[in-house]
Design a protein with these regions (language model features):
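Terminal catalytic/cofactor-binding subdomain
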Residues: 1-118
Length: 118
């Protein structure tokens, strides 16, 4: 059995039935100012990651989206879970629109990258 098939078999052996299987994702991004410096994590006299987190959570209060501030200062979006990948794609598009509109207003940029803190 190929490595791909063994991995697939292992993953699916721990999964639930097709009728109840759902999919979700987590997306992390770092936020930078116009000088390519990361924005502060804590509240201060400039727009911070903490300010962004509060605004994102307010904007998503009527959904199952979850936002958090990660140890490296990046913002993480955890999607709701969906049965259809198209619904997940729609949720991702809404998340991107929400965060991008805030960043544009504040003159900030994002870098989407997953990191390992160790």
């Amino acid at each position: 059995m190929s490595v791909k098939n063994r991995l697939k078999s292992y993953i699916l052996s721990k999964s639930i039935g097709d009728k109840t299987r759902k999919i979700g994702i987590e997306v992390e991004c770092f936020i930078f100012d116009k000088n390519k410096k990361r924005i502060p994590v804590n509240k201060c006299d400039t727009f911070s990651a903490s300010d962004l987190l509060v605004e994102l959570n307010l904007n998503s209060k009527n959904s199952n989206d979850q936002y958090s501030l990660e140890p490296g200062g990046q913002i993480e979006w955890a999607s709701p879970v969906f049965e259809k990948i198209q619904d997940l794609d729609n949720a991702l598009s809404k998340h991107k629109h929400s965060i991008d509109s805030i960043l544009k207003r504040e003159g900030l940029q994002s870098l989407y990258i997953g990191v390992d803190p160790f």
